[in-house]
Amino acid sequence: MTNNKLLFKKDVNGPWSLPIIGGIYLINDNPNRALTKLSKKYGGIYKIWLGESFSMVVSDPEIVNEIWVKQHDNFINRPKNITHKMFSSNYRSLNFGDNPNWKFNRSMASSHFTKTKLLSSKVTSVVEKKLNKLIETMEYHSINKLPFDSYVGFSEYSLNIILNMLVSMDIDECENSTQNVIYSINEIFKMLSTNSPQYSFPYLKFFFKKDLNNFKFHLDKIKSFIHSIYLKQLESYDPSNPRNILDSFISDLQSNDIDILLQICIDIVVAGTDTVANLLQWFVLFCINYPEIQEKLYNEIIEVVGKDCKVLKYEHISKMPYLYGCFRESLRIRPVTPLSLPRVAKCDTYIKDDIFIPKGATIIQNIFGMGNDEKYISEPNKFKPERWVEYIKNKKVNKNGNENSVNKYFNDLDKISIPFGVGKRQCLSPAMAEQESLLSIATVVLNYKLKSNGQKKLNEKEVYSITIKPQPFKLFLEKRV
């Protein structure tokens, strides 16, 4: 492909490309913002060369649906690069695997994360038990007026829920320390990012040897951690009496392919831990920055459960529309995976009849751009949970709040805010992330006023890797009376 020439009769617009680097000169430390800025100039789908990778960036809801839902089979696979290959054991994982590996792995894993199973007494009791432990830890910090490390605390909370579902144990029962595992997960996500240099310049991997060695070091630590859990599980494994998800995986994989089994577990542990921890951090940050919203949320919670309740249960959550509005608004304005995971076109194709996508093109779904564009949502930079409360009310009477707009997607929030993706390859368990987050944040707000150590608002600009997290901040917990 010649970078600055019209490639095809129905070619889309895009920025000017420089030799070798393409359009990378336009990308900063926050690719989600840089790509969103470009969409305002070049439209809801545009082309950009990222080094030697020909990419197309999509932030138009209709085109997203066309590619990720209607033409799913043509865009099922991921683009290939060295870190994805290393992480996925040669593209055999849930997140980075190709068909047919991905399809088999997804089918096996998803059956354990249905909404029905997640609401079973076995799972809900695990979540409530870990939530009690989280509150105990917070209580210690509150009494002693110590800052609470929200990333580590929420990561440990989420990690223990996943491990209990997966192997019926806490991380404390494993040989690895909690902070080491969490740190390694964080380092892995940095290197999997679309703005890592080895993503755009794979032929220069020799020059990134130090980074790749660091990636391998942390990946090996996580693999060793999962493998040790697997060996411990085997000691008491009874095929006639599966105790947890890993037991079921062992039974399902008749071929005894240990590598695939371990890879699926790694995907679940790594993605599940980081996603929920970052989601909760953003929720807390917005509660701190908008104390009036935090108090309105608190009043809704005590109206449902009273002040004597200490830990909420799942049945309480459905009675709290404002809580749900805060959750969805947090995910709209700061979606945890702002550019999702890219896809690659298997064959030449047309979308919307006249937009040509060539075979081999990398397709980037700009979730951040879609949910933060004034073309699709009123006052996109404002944190307004009320918009979701009103939207859900209107949906019940078949309205979406955009009857007077020329744009059919304007303020149609479910269409323009898709934090977990769409289609067959969306997040494995949005329901799990939602349940964990709603229950934990409501319980935390019920027990504590969330504050920072200063009068200024916390910085709302994100730190980008494959997911986004807030700038480091200190969380102080003031006991409610």
Curated annotation (Swiss-Prot):
Check the record and name the CDD domains matching this protein: CYP1_2-like
Q: Pfam families from the xrefs?
A: p450
Assigned keywords, A-Z: Heme, Iron, Metal-binding, Monooxygenase, Oxidoreductase
Show the GO MF annotations.
Answer: heme binding; iron ion binding; monooxygenase activity; oxidoreductase activity, acting on paired donors, with incorporation or reduction of molecular oxygen
This entry's Enzyme Commission designation comes to 1.14.-.-
Organism domain of life: Eukaryota
Cofactor needs? heme
Positions of heme binding: 427
Name the family.
Belongs to the cytochrome P450 family.
User: Which protein is depicted?
Assistant: Putative cytochrome P450 520B1
Species source reads Dictyostelium discoideum (Social amoeba)
